[in-house]
A protein has these predicted regions:
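Transmembrane-helix boundary/entry motifs in multi-pass membrane transporters
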Residues: 1, 22-50, 68-73, 211-226, ...
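Hydrophobic, membrane-embedded alpha-helices of multi-pass small-molecule transporters
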Residues: 1, 47-51, 55, 117-122, ...
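Juxtamembrane transmembrane-helix boundary signature
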Residues: 2-28, 196-200
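Transmembrane alpha-helical segments of multi-pass small-molecule transport proteins
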Residues: 6, 41-48, 68-92, 154-161, ...
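Membrane-water interface regions at transmembrane-helix termini and the short interhelical loops
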Residues: 21, 58-68, 82-103, 167-171, ...
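Hydrophobic alpha-helical segments and their helix-loop junctions in multi-pass secondary transporters
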Residues: 107-133, 295-315
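Long, low-complexity, intrinsically disordered cytosolic termini of multi-pass membrane proteins
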Residues: 314-391
């Protein structure tokens, strides 16, 4: 868990900072800039395969979840999940993001709750619990390879959205710190889940969804609630995978998105009948190895580009500070002194000049407009703004 936590924190920092530096709107922007065109294409294909593979594994998992807790036929839970994904997938991206975001707190609460209960009800013989956990069969025997493979899998899932989230933050420095904080939080949650499973390995062994078995053993009613939460977790992942897959395959042909999205979901539904555990045992390790390679490539590119990234971070932060001074109604701005400096920094940036200027103006005007102590009206500013004043 410690090794996985360190890798996750480093990779989170790398993904978000590279996304910010290249102002990425999709993962290919970064892949194309840091690797050979052939490698970039292979990474893109690997991400596409991952999106589809995890999508159909989630549909299978939805069926197993409901079968384990309520005794439903697996196809019922999978079909219900398919319908939910198809309905929500037809919404616009902002609404999809809100649906996904609404589910996340319940997941965190559930994991913390199980960990607290486990801590208050530790097994009498911790050594026996550890021994029992070591007897559980895993797709990958070696503990170190297993930790690396798990990281590869998780990061392969996260890379596409992480690069885009990083690209939405104009400051590489802030994006990097966001990656550190996110990696630490993820590591804590992973540690809590691992602790719970380790101390209750006798109850979790043999079940498709171990965490559900733990909660159901405590109380069947809580088990039913947990089954619903896990179903929401599965939905969270499934909609993210199939939606991203549809967007990627319809890039440049956005009107085709609904058809591609529906076909992708139906194809995933068909494959899901191979069974959740079977799919996990074969699909997850393969994706994990692809993820290890991808992380190694991006981390190497990040280390190699550190000086440029840091220079760009300083450059953008300096322009932002000068723009704040320039637009603040209560501060004196020396145009003769600073206009040329702003223009030079923008020219030196790796970002498109107009895109960088517009992004920084948007950030600064949003901040000033939201400050009750500053007499600044963003709408009036935009009405009176006719050109980019740094030109």
């Amino acid at each position: 868990i410690i090794i996985a936590a360190l890798i996750m924190t480093l990779a989170g920092t790398v993904f978000l900072q590279l996304g910010s530096y290249f102002h990425a709107s999709e993962h290919n922007t970064v892949f194309r800039n840091v690797t050979h065109p052939i490698v970039s294409k292979l990474l893109d294909i690997a991400v596409i395969i991952t999106l589809f593979a995890i999508g159909f594994v989630m549909l299978a998992g939805a069926g197993s979840n409901m079968e384990q807790q309520f005794g439903w036929k697996t196809w019922i839970g999978s079909t219900l999940m398919l319908v939910l994904v198809l309905i929500v997938g037809m919404l616009d991206v902002d609404k999809v993001s809100k649906v996904i975001g609404a589910v996340t707190p319940t997941i965190i609460i559930a994991v913390i709750g199980v960990a607290i209960y486990t801590g208050l009800n530790m097994p009498d013989d911790i050594g026996a619990a550890m021994d029992a956990s070591s007897q559980i069969d895993t797709p990958i025997g070696n503990w170190l390879i297993s930790a690396l493979n798990y990281n590869g899998l998780a990061l392969m899932l996260a890379v596409s959205m992480s690069l885009v989230i990083g690209g939405d933050n104009i400051s590489p420095r802030e994006a990097g710190w966001g990656g550190v904080v996110g990696g630490v939080i993820y590591s804590i949650m992973m540690g809590l889940a691992g602790f719970s499973l380790l101390m209750n390995s006798d109850k979790a062994q043999g079940s498709d969804i171990p965490m559900l078995s733990l909660v159901d053993d405590v109380n069947p009613t809580l088990g039913a609630i947990m089954a619903v939460i896990i179903y929401m977790m599965i939905f969270n992942t499934a909609i993210g995978m199939f939606y991203a897959l549809g967007k990627r395959l319809s890039a440049g042909h956005e009107k085709r998105f609904p058809v591609i999205f529906i076909v992708g979901c139906l194809a995933g539904f068909a494959v899901s009948f191979a069974g959740f555990k079977t799919l996990m045992n074969y699909i997850y390790p393969v994706i994990g190895y692809m993820g290890i390679l991808m992380v190694a490539i991006l981390v190497f590119a990040w280390f190699r580009s550190q000086s440029q990234i840091q220079d760009e971070a300083v450059r953008r932060e300096r322009v932002r500070a000068l723009m704040h001074l320039k637009l603040h109604p209560d501060k004196d701005y020396d145009a003769e002194r600073y206009d040329d400096e702003i223009g030079q920094h923008i020219e030196d940036s790796n970002m498109d000049n107009e895109a960088l200027y517009d992004e920084l103006v948007e950030e600064v005007t949003e901040e000033l407009d939201g400050d009750d102590d500053v007499d600044f009206d963003k709408e009036k500013y935009e009405e009176n703004r006719h050109d980019h004043s740094y030109y």
